[in-house]
């Protein structure tokens, strides 16, 4: 499982097991453009069939989820597109009440049918579906209420619904190819363009239900090489990057660059 990566100017830091180093370049307070280095190119922007962390880094800005981790240090799941939720006494039914002010980037309002569609599509995903495998069925009881049914109680279920992006059912059904290459979400940034092997460009969603982002233009530059990425930070070509420990001394020597060590969550395993 990979949680939303910390972009201090965009979102909050998630914590737990492994340390990672990030470098940021000092910027003018009124700067409205941000360039972030990616370690590798993406293969898709499909909301459920992605398989890499860099894809999720981009998708996190385009889409939102029902719930998210509270960044106050406790990291408890809290509502996002969902306004509130209840859990039945037997732990088998989770009822989510949706906000009424969430719109997709094309102007369509998010409905319970979109949420049902998104959870069902996510569960079918070869790459992501295991995160909500405990979900037996899901239904919309009205336009703003979704009920998830489990066969057996599963206490971490709320953590499971932190990951599925909420997608527009009508957009997917209209053009599944565009769904994977020209995504339409509800997040703080809208997809603009992609140059394969080079960059992905996003622009601020001025109608974002949580408030328009201060950063208006967000670009992800594909820079796999560690040394090249370090040079790009020093020249100001990029403003934010995950950096390797081998280049830390040269970056720390630059007063315009700030290094932050943060905690991130993940699973590591050995295949036998």
Predicted features along the sequence, with ranges:
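Ligand-binding "clamshell"
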Residues: 132, 250-261
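Aromatic- and charge-enriched surface segment that lines or borders ligand/interaction sites
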Residues: 83-126, 141, 147
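N-terminal lobe/hinge region of extracytoplasmic solute-binding protein
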Residues: 37-89, 120, 184
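Short, well-ordered beta-strand elements
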Residues: 31-40, 83, 93-96, 115-118, ...
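Ligand-site clamp/hinge motif
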Residues: 205-251, 265
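Sec-dependent signal peptide cleavage junction
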Residues: 20-30
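Surface-exposed binding/hinge segments that line
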Residues: 90, 130-171
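Gly/Pro-rich hinge or "lid" segments in bacterial periplasmic/extracellular proteins
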Residues: 70-72, 162-213, 217
């Amino acid at each position: 499982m990979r949680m939303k990566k910390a972009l201090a100017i965009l979102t909050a830091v998630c914590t737990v097991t492994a340390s990672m180093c990030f470098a940021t370049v000092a910027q003018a307070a009124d700067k409205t453009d941000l360039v972030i280095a990616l370690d590798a190119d993406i293969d898709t922007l499909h909301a459920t069939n992605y398989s890499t962390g860099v894809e999720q880094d981009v998708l996190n800005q385009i889409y939102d989820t029902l719930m998210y981790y509270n960044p106050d240090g406790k990291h408890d799941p809290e509502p996002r597109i969902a306004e509130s939720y209840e859990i039945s006494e037997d732990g088998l039914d989770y009822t989510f009440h949706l906000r009424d002010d969430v719109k997709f980037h094309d102007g369509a309002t998010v409905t319970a049918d979109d949420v049902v569609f998104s959870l069902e599509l996510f569960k079918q995903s070869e790459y992501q579906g295991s995160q909500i495998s405990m979900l037996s069925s899901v239904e919309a009881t009205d336009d703003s209420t979704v009920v998830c049914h489990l066969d057996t109680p599963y206490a971490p279920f709320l953590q499971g619904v932190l990951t599925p992006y909420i997608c527009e059912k009508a957009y997917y059904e209209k053009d599944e190819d565009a769904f994977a290459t020209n995504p339409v979400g509800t997040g703080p940034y809208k997809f603009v363009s992609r140059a394969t092997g080079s960059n992905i460009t996003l622009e601020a969603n001025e109608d974002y239900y949580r408030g328009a982002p201060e950063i208006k233009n967000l670009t992800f530059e594909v820079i796999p090489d560690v040394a090249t990425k370090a040079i790009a930070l020093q020249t100001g070509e990029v403003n934010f990057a995950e950096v390797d420990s081998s280049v830390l001394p040269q970056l720390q020597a630059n007063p315009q660059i700030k290094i932050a060590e943060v905690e991130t969550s993940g699973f590591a395993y050995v295949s036998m």
